């Protein structure tokens, strides 16, 4: 079968934006990323080891093509020196290892952050597609197409509802857990054709380039987590990360992620300066209604018109959930909805809940204190307890 990954642009936009920011601010950072499967697969993922090794061998032969680099240069927030770096960039096979750990698959990328952070999305795509190849492909695609048509029907019926102050906008965040590259492309093309009034873009930079769509994304947890090890006082790591982001992008890419140490701790750092500079906030764990109300109350306390800001929701969303959140918030603020697995891998086969997370930076543990049970990741319980103490973040049961 052909390789799963065939071009390096088929990655989330926020991978490039974080990559650029970290290359400029902390090019010397040494990091460790680790693959984790959060749920029980239908068969042991360790059986995929040899195939994953082969796919990674191929990945490390790829380079950015001239037309891909030209596209990145066309994005106003991409700097010429970063694209020049990508011109000579190659993944180094020595930085990533694959091992069977009983029934589990252990994948670790260890090395300079600017050389290993790009592995994440490709590893997830590779594992997910290899895993799903053992299921009935034709039956899966038939069911996936039926479900996609049902989503389009839901969207068209939703259009008959009373108009709200702000429009409903959703976008594709599905590259990391897609059924396959071909199916992901079919989903994006179909939505762009059938419901362009609602479907506003994709995080997949390759598909955005190919179909003239808006590439979507700003930052992920790893960007903020890395600052836990960058020499600032731990209590100040979020402020340092946000400040460097502001200096890098000067008003572009203005959606801040809030749940690295919980929403309450984030808002304590998100003062008038940041609240004015950033265009909005992204929710990725915890109760979305409670989170959104906290965000709006925070803007009100700072005397900022929430109608000029945007709340982006991206935590395990489907369309009915997005509609419900839209109805709740759309008359008070701009909204946006990033839908991933439910778009690119809704086939009837239970999806793997897989991630590849930053676990250490510069020899120190880093952690995310999620607002949802099961999403907190850290190997060092002592550091985790200290982080909870510093940010007054209780364990989520």
UniProtKB/Swiss-Prot annotation:
Q: Which residues carry this modification: Phosphohistidine?
A: 221
What the entry lists under InterPro entries is as follows:
N/Namide_PRibTrfase, NAPRTase_N, Nic_PRibTrfase, Nic_PRibTrfase-Fam, Nicotinate_pribotase-like_C
Reactions accelerated catalytically:
nicotinate + 5-phospho-alpha-D-ribose 1-diphosphate + ATP + H2O = nicotinate beta-D-ribonucleotide + ADP + phosphate + diphosphate
- One Pfam entry name: NAPRTase_N
State any GO CC term.
cytosol
This entry's Gene Ontology molecular function terms read: nicotinate phosphoribosyltransferase activity
Entry EC number(s): 6.3.4.21
Q: Which family does it belong to?
A: Belongs to the NAPRTase family.
Query: What NCBIfam families does its record include?
Result: NAPRTase (TIGR01514), PRK05321.1 (NF003704)
What is the protein name for this chain? Answer: Nicotinate phosphoribosyltransferase
